Regions:
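Hot-dog-fold acyl-thioester-processing enzymes
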Residues: 2-63, 110-112, 118-198
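HotDog/MaoC-like acyl-thioester-processing domains
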Residues: 2-12, 67-150, 208-210, 219-249
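Small beta-barrel nucleic-acid-binding modules, principally OB-folds
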Residues: 58-73, 195-207
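Short coil-to-beta-strand transition motifs
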Residues: 78-79, 155-157, 212-213
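Acidic/His-leaning functional-site neighborhoods
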Residues: 161-245
């Protein structure tokens, strides 16, 4: 990734690699989340409160929710621009907006997410201004609205698995991108082959660790799928995915 930034808007040029692409030649949906995590940390470091800053104070940035709109996913070998900007939203939350733009400047993926800083020992959020004296004054309103799905009257399909060590990140819990992978893995191949992902809505509620037994409750209604990602009876994360019928090549 090639970086170019101001303190207000941080931008990166990046090219989609082979291992970031699926069988259809498009970027894997979870790679979008990995890219967003990478540029978010780079921008936070540029502003003076990135990974090194928070870990030196026994703190960590954690993502609370993410809402993304997908016009299309970048193609293998396509070079795109990632853009991000942020601002404090509440005493405990910062909002970060992100975009992926193609070579013509078209926004092909947009996202709006909320982040908190937690005390690593207590695993509890702390007021942002306790440790961070400066936030950009860049306007950072919600650009992608959350989407909910009425699951009343629907019976779920259930899938079970064990959270794996390879999905653990620096914060010693399962990385947020894994929840999207789990949600997608719960869908039948026939659905994935005939539908195109147009929206990703993730609400992260509790940490998950390697070795945790997990299950997915999948609900389908029209162009939405709802995924309750559970550990026993405890909801760890909820995903609502938006779809449209795939175009015939």
């Amino acid at each position: 990734m090639e970086h170019a930034s101001t303190r207000e808007i941080y931008s990166v040029q990046a090219t989609v690699r082979t291992y970031e692409s699926g069988a259809d030649g498009l970027m894997k949906p979870e790679t979008v989340l990995h890219w967003f995590q990478e540029i978010a940390e780079a921008h936070a470091s540029c502003l003076g409160f990135g990974y090194d800053f928070v870990t030196s104070r026994s703190l960590a940035w954690v993502e609370v929710r993410l809402d993304a709109s997908v016009n299309r996913l970048p193609r293998w070998k396509e070079t795109v621009e990632l853009r991000t900007w942020m601002a404090q939203e509440t005493p405990l939350l910062a909002r970060r907006n992100l975009e992926i733009r193609d070579a013509q400047g078209n926004c092909i993926v947009a996202a709006s997410c909320l982040w908190a800083v937690i005390d690593i020992r207590r695993r509890r959020p702390v007021p942002l201004n306790r440790h961070i004296s400066f936030f950009p004054d860049t306007p950072c309103k919600e650009t992608v609205a959350p989407v909910s799905m009425d699951i009343s009257g629907l019976l779920p399909s259930i899938r079970e698995w064990t959270a794996e060590r390879r999905d653990t990140d620096f914060n010693r819990h399962i990385n947020n991108a894994a929840y999207l992978v789990w949600a997608l893995d719960s869908l039948p191949d026939s659905w994935l082959e005939n539908h195109q992902l147009t929206g990703i809505h993730l609400h992260f509620r509790k940490e998950t660790h390697a070795g945790d037994s997990m299950k997915s409750l999948l609900f389908l209604r029209d162009s939405l799928t709802s995924h309750h990602l559970m550990h026993g009876d405890e909801l760890r994360a909820e995903a609502v995915l938006e779809w449209k019928t795939a175009e015939i090549a």
